[in-house]
Amino acid sequence: MLLKSPPAWPAVSRGLPRARLVCPSRPPTLRLRRLRAAAALSEPPTFAGRYGKWTLTDNDRAEVLAYRAALNLLAFSFDAAAAAALLGDETTQQQVLNVASVGGVVGLGAALFLVRSAKRRGARTELLSHLVQVHMYVTPIKRFMQALWLAGTVGCVALAFTNADMPVATYVASHPQAVWLIGPVFAALTGLSFKEGACYGTPESVALFFAVPALLLGKLAGAPDDVEKLLLVVVALLLSVFALRKWTQPLQADIGDKSIFDFMALPPDEQQRREVELEKLERGF
């Protein structure tokens, strides 16, 4: 019986490792899956909203980071002013208080205001102006908070020009009735604290909602100096915790449900139609 010799390798394969011939390459489907996974990672995250899905864009991220940075500027400025008022001498107070006051007012204003660039829709252009990342769905409340901040800022500027020989904070400390001029700024901060506390339930936001008015009312009512100092320290600490903890929250938390904003931008007839469709879906029709 003759033994057959094993078949020779093709000429093109001579000199190549046998394992390379057995498994020439990874299956194309594996590479395709990896490409799809990489593409999915590069796409903006999608969230389910009340009126449909929405995505977190780069502009959204930039706005949230700007909002949180503005809150930290507000907190740092208030802390610096409180430290100068409680621990600094007259020279330090002259150097720090007005600068810190400007920083605090600017920080709160930056957290409340944003004028977005014009968006062209068809043949018309409309300018969208609203609160920044304080994404509140009731526009009159937004405008009211803006108006409070603006009124308090005007009061601060008026005090600075009429009493140029001393910082605004020093003048208010010795003239309690001046609280009525700067108070609207703190009222806007109180409203912001209420929004944050209602949305996220953070204890420092809830505490700020009560501590800030208590500080102003204590000054108006002529509270003892020790009580005023204690309230000042409490507000400074709460603001610091509030501003720093914002960095630990998910970015989409400060955006809100973008599908609601898109819905509110629709004409009333379209809003009603969408509501009817949503109600049918919820009922299973």
Residue ranges with predicted function:
Residues 252-284:
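Short, highly charged, low-complexity non-transmembrane loops/tails of multi-pass membrane proteins
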Residues 1-32, 37-40:
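N-terminal chloroplast transit peptides
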Residues 93-105, 124, 170-183:
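Structural signature of hydrophobic alpha-helical transmembrane segments
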Residues 101, 121-124, 139-152, 175-179, ...:
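Cytoplasmic-side transmembrane-helix entry/capping segments in multi-pass membrane proteins
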Residues 64-84:
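The first (N-terminal) embedded transmembrane alpha-helix
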Residues 149-158, 206-219, 262-270:
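Small-residue-rich segments of transmembrane alpha-helices in multi-pass membrane proteins
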Residues 110-122, 127-139, 189-199:
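C-terminal ends of transmembrane helices
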Residues 180-186, 201-218, 230-241:
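Alpha-helical membrane segments in multi-pass integral membrane proteins
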